[in-house]
Amino acid sequence: MKIHLVHAHPEPKSFTASMRDVIIETLEAQGHSVTLSDLYAMKFNPVASPEDFGERRDPDHLTYALEQRHNWKQGTIAPDIASEIEKVLAADTLGFTFPLHWFGTPAILKGWIERVFISGPFYGGKRVYGEGGLKGKRAFTAFALGGRPHMFGDGSIHGPLESGMMKHFFQGTLGYIGVDVVAPFIAWHVPYISDDARKQMLDDLAEYVRTLDDQPLLEMPDISNFNDRFEPR
């Protein structure tokens, strides 16, 4: 199996970096092939701009998604974007490691998504959710935060993470492009716990990765329940 891992943390010695390393070591020990985009180490440019396109469909007015589609077909999309797209398309499984920032991904990862998950091969028209461009692939996530488990979930102060604060990522991004979204591994309260507790988390993460095939999937909209205009049937 081919896995492409996207890592977003500016500190090479961070706990999130340790999670990245555990994931790679565990997958490779199972015989899988792993590629990595370490966004800070790469100095990846997260800013979408007109410079992303070598041949403008409309030189007078930038409609970013339409230019993405046009330039992908023409082979004129920026090389740094094209390289990342090829890594994603070549993978069977995508993985993401990051710290939670304001109940979302770090800005550099959000920018990577905006520039790399392009209209055309990833989504477009009725090609979303179960019919999305990456149908048949799957994605998993391991992220760290300072909060405790009791702060999240039904009836908690913040509500659920996967179907609440981070629905924009799990459904609005990963699910939208058609991948099967594995329930995430969450490292809780990381800055405030003991070294032994953090080590146990890394052991738990290794087990999560080893048993990835058995992890539950997050529920996504069933496109068959909607007509061609996405109205409920």
What residues fall within each predicted segment?
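N-terminal beta1-alpha1-beta2 submodule of the flavodoxin-like/Rossmannoid cofactor-binding fold
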Residues: 1-98, 103-121, 203-233
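Solvent-exposed loop/turn segments at secondary-structure junctions
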Residues: 102-103, 146-148
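Glycine-rich phosphate/pyrophosphate-binding loop and the adjoining helix
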Residues: 152, 157-233
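Conserved catalytic-site loops of classical short-chain dehydrogenases/reductases
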Residues: 93, 138-140
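Glycine-rich His-Gly loop
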Residues: 8-10, 144, 151
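Hydrophobic/aromatic beta-strand patches that form the interior of the parallel beta-sheet core
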Residues: 4-6, 35-37, 140-143, 182-185
